[in-house]
């Protein structure tokens, strides 16, 4: 507990906010180019082949981004839009690729939560 005199001399230090997605530099999304597209296995209780991409953003930083949805058309040199948001069972994956934007096509035959996966409304 500081004294009044210490507060007058130094004041209170503001609490520094640490960004959850520092590579985006405060932007909601950022464009990038896929460097590697591969699959990885998740942490302990889960088992799958999760699709991820290593993306070089326009600011020069390289991040690992998750590719959501079933099936994708991404390959090396694909231009993608990246947003923040981690994948809990993949350590080090703190970004997601936005489906239906730039080179990332929307998920085919998607009926529910379509806007999240860039899918058009199906014909009756």
From Swiss-Prot:
GO terms for cellular component: small ribosomal subunit. Transmembrane segments: none annotated. Keywords: Methylation, Ribonucleoprotein, Ribosomal protein, RNA-binding, rRNA-binding, tRNA-binding. The modification 3-methylthioaspartic acid is found at residue 89. GO terms for biological process: translation. It comes from the Bacteria. Gene3D superfamilies: Nucleic acid-binding proteins (2.40.50.140). One of its GO terms (molecular function) is tRNA binding. PROSITE patterns: RIBOSOMAL_S12 (PS00055). Belongs to the universal ribosomal protein uS12 family. NCBIfam families: rpsL_bact. Part of the 30S ribosomal subunit. Contacts proteins S8 and S17. May interact with IF1 in the 30S initiation complex. This is Small ribosomal subunit protein uS12. It comes from Thermoanaerobacter pseudethanolicus (strain ATCC 33223 / 39E) (Clostridium thermohydrosulfuricum).
């Amino acid at each position: 507990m500081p004294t009044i005199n210490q507060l007058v001399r130094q004041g209170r230090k503001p609490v520094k906010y640490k960004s959850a997605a520092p590579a985006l530099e405060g932007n909601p999304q950022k464009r990038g180019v896929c460097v590697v597209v591969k699959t990885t296995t998740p942490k302990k209780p889960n088992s799958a082949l999760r699709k991820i991409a290593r993306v070089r953003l326009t600011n020069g930083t390289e991040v690992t981004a998750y590719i959501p949805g079933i099936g994708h058309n991404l390959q090396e040199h694909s231009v993608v839009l990246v947003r923040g948001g981690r994948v809990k069972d993949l350590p080090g994956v703190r970004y997601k690729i936005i489906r239906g934007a730039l080179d990332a096509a929307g998920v085919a035959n998607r009926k529910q939560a379509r806007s999240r996966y860039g899918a058009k409304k199906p014909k009756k």
